[in-house]
Amino acid sequence: MASPFSGALQLTDLDDFIGPSQECIKPVKVEKRAGSGVAKIRIEDDGSYFQINQDGGTRRLEKAKVSLNDCLACSGCITSAETVLITQQSHEELKKVLDANKMAAPSQQRLVVVSVSPQSRASLAARFQLNPTDTARKLTSFFKKIGVHFVFDTAFSRHFSLLESQREFVRRFRGQADCRQALPLLASACPGWICYAEKTHGSFILPHISTARSPQQVMGSLVKDFFAQQQHLTPDKIYHVTVMPCYDKKLEASRPDFFNQEHQTRDVDCVLTTGEVFRLLEEEGVSLPDLEPAPLDSLCSGASAEEPTSHRGGGSGGYLEHVFRHAARELFGIHVAEVTYKPLRNKDFQEVTLEKEGQVLLHFAMAYGFRNIQNLVQRLKRGRCPYHYVEVMACPSGCLNGGGQLQAPDRPSRELLQHVERLYGMVRAEAPEDAPGVQELYTHWLQGTDSECAGRLLHTQYHAVEKASTGLGIRW
C-alpha cells in the first residue's frame, strides 16, 4: 500500500524499509527506580497486561500510545506505520465530537467549525462531476446536516499568508546587504518540505524559509482567536477541523508552535484529507450531488462568502506569482501584466525573471517534488543558487496532486490531475490586497500590518531536529 505522506517525508536513505517494532526511532530515557526488582508480565485473555511482582502483587500496565506529537518525520513510523500516528486526526474523531455534542447540555457543547481548502474542493468536484461552486455549497450543506455549525473557505486565510509572504520578501530583499542568509526566501506553506528541512538540513536551511504561516494555520488563528472573540467563547470551546489535500497537514497541525498553552487547545484540532471526507460521505450514506446547496459562512461582516474564491498562480496557492508581482511593483515600480514561466529540467522546476534593459532584477523559481528540492538545496550549499525566491512543494505537480486527494481507479492519474486543475481554475481569482474584509481585520483584529499581534498570529518559527546517536543505528 502506498504511503499517503509526501515523498519528502518518506525518503531518507536506502535502508528505509523497517517494521515499526524493529527499531525505536525516538528513544526515551527511563529512570531506574530504587528498590525495583525482577517482575513477570502476564497477558490476560482480553489482551490486557499485568505486572506480577516478586511479592505476588499485581499491577495493570497501561498501553503505550503514539500521537502526532511524537513524530520526528524520520525514517520509521512515517514509512511503515503512519496509521499509528493519526489516531487523533481522522473523520472518526470528528464523529465522536459531533456525537458528544448531541448528548451534552447546551452549555457543554463545543462549536464545530470546518475550513475547506480550494484543492480539496476541486478534487471532490471532479469525483462528483460538479462545478467547484456547487461543490462548495453542497459540502457546506452536508457538514451542517451532520452537526457542524460553521463552514469556511481557506482561500480567505490564504489572503493573509500571501500578503505576509509578499511583505517579508520585500523586507529581506532590501536588507540583503546586511544579512547573508536573507535570500533566497523559500516558501513555507508545505509541511512535508518543512519537516524535511528541519530534519535533514537544520540550521543551514531554516534561516531561508519564510516565517509566514500556511493558510491552514492562519485559519487556525482566525478561528481560535478572532472568531472565538466574536462568538464570546474561549478557544477550547471551539473544535476546528480543516479539509486538506495532504496527509502532511496533520503533522503541521500537531506542531507545538500551534498549541495554545493557556487554554490547552490547538489552532487546528483535526485535519481531514479529501479522501477522508469522501469516506465520511459514504459512511453517512450521502450522495453529494443530491444535496440542496447552502451558502458558505463569513468570518467577518466585511468578507463576502456568496461563492468560493481562489488566487492566480496555480494550484499550490500562487506564492511565486503573488510575491513576484508585488516585489516588481514595490521594489522597481514595474507592473507585471502576465507572469511567464520558463520550464527547466522538467515541468516541476520552472523559472521566472524580471528584466530591465538587459539586467535581471528578480529571479524566482518553483521547485515541486523531492528530486527538485534536493537539487535546490545542493545549489544553495554550493553557493550557486541564483534565485531570490522559490515556491517549494513536496508533491510533484503541487498541492492538487497531494496524497490526500481522490484517485480514480478507472482513469489515468495524469488525465485526472488535468481535470482537477481545470476545475480549480474555474473559480474566480481574487487579489489578496483587494479582498473584502482583509484590511478590516488587519486594522481591528491585528492592530496593523507590522504589529506584535500580526507577528504572533500570522508567523511561526522552525526548529532543527537533532539526530540522536544511539546503539539502535549500528548495523552488524
Curated annotation (Swiss-Prot):
External component of the CIA complex. In the CIA complex, interacts directly with CIAO1 and MMS19. Pfam families: Fe_hyd_lg_C, Fe_hyd_SSU. It comes from the Eukaryota. [4Fe-4S] cluster 1 binds at C24, C71, C74, C77. Disulfide bonds: none annotated. PANTHER family: NITRATE, FORMATE, IRON DEHYDROGENASE. [4Fe-4S] cluster 2 binds at C190, C246, C395, C399. Keywords: 4Fe-4S, Acetylation, Iron, Iron-sulfur, Metal-binding. Belongs to the NARF family. Widely expressed. It comes from Homo sapiens (Human). GO terms for biological process: hematopoietic progenitor cell differentiation; intracellular oxygen homeostasis; iron-sulfur cluster assembly; regulation of gene expression; response to hypoxia. This is Cytosolic iron-sulfur assembly component 3.
